[in-house]
């Protein structure tokens, strides 16, 4: 008889190797909260991809769709999206082939935003007026990590100021959260003049842009990782972590499901297909922390 996590029985759950997943989950459970850290993407991973059939905005979209952006700028940003997004998710191109296109996309978009005379105080307002939503079950997720002293490292190619404000407005911005993202750089008179540090895009989310060796050094006893992402580029987010013993990779498959399913199942341990909740992640956390409901099942 094998003990399994009941949330893994959800219809949205796909696993190429259920036995392997069970081994990793058992190892995470043996380590408990003391050994665990979570590394996650933000846009369309912690935030929702869609609600009632409507696409939800990413942190970039929130700004693109806001009234502080001119109509011309919005049009140009939309054109960039329609040109580059198909390249980003094209299953027939290698990451190496996509890289220069992603750099061009982010650089052009950031350059357009810097021409808009965006002011720092407008960020909270723009987020408040947006339709951004965190996935169902977000409060339990953020609170469970915080109350069990489990660090949450958010590695995002979005806009740091925006996603931080979303988490704040949802009242779950706890002290255990560390964010690496594209943060806005404001002039002394409060206008956006650029972005700080190295550009982070979908396909360089790894130790090359991560000036966080000291962050991970402090957590060197946290040798077990749950990684959450929604793109193939998210799989490298834990590359800068020293001494990893066990890592469980969970991928949200939100878009172009049919053509990307096989690749996701080859790459992620657990794939969540069109699942707008954090139920599976929360169920796993409860299980690892020995708080969860388990069902007895025949071994996988």
Swiss-Prot record:
Mg(2+) binds at residues 41, 43, 230. The modification N6-acetyllysine is found at residue 256. It is an enzyme of class 3 (hydrolase). One of its GO terms (cellular component) is cytoplasm. The active site is at 41 (nucleophile), 43 (proton donor). GO terms for molecular function: hydrolase activity; magnesium ion binding; nucleotide binding. Monomer. Belongs to the pyrimidine 5'-nucleotidase family. This is 7-methylguanosine phosphate-specific 5'-nucleotidase. The gene is Nt5c3b.
């Amino acid at each position: 008889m094998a003990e399994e996590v009941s949330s893994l029985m959800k219809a949205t759950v796909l696993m190429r190797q259920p036995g392997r997943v069970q081994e990793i989950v058992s190892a995470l459970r043996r380590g408990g909260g003391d050994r665990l850290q979570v590394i996650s993407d933000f846009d369309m991973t912690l935030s929702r991809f869609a609600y009632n059939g409507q696409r939800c905005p990413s942190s970039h979209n929130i700004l693109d769709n806001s009234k502080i952006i001119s109509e011309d700028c919005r049009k140009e940003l939309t054109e960039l999206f329609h040109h580059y997004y198909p390249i980003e998710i094209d299953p027939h191109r290698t990451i190496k082939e996509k890289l220069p296109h992603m750099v061009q996309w982010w650089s052009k978009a950031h350059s357009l935003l810097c021409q808009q005379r965006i002011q720092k105080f407008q960020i909270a307002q723009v987020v408040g007026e947006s339709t951004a939503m965190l996935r169902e079950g977000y409060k339990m997720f953020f609170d469970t990590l915080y109350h069990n002293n489990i660090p949450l490292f958010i590695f995002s190619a979005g806009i740091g100021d925006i996603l931080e404000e979303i988490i704040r407005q949802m009242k779950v911005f706890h002290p255990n959260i560390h964010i690496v993202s594209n943060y806005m750089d404001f002039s002394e008179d409060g206008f956006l003049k650029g972005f700080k540090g190295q550009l982070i895009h979908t396909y360089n989310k790894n130790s090359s842009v991560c000036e966080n060796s000291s962050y991970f050094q402090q957590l060197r006893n946290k040798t077990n990782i749950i990684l959450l992402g929604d793109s193939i580029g998210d799989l490298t987010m834990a590359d800068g972590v020293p001494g990893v013993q066990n890592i469980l990779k969970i991928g949200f498959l939100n878009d172009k499901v049919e053509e990307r399913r096989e690749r996701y199942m080859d790459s992620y341990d657990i794939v969540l297909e069109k699942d707008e909740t954090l139920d599976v992640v929360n169920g796993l956390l409860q299980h690892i922390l020995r708080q969860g409901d388990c069902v007895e099942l025949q071994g996988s």
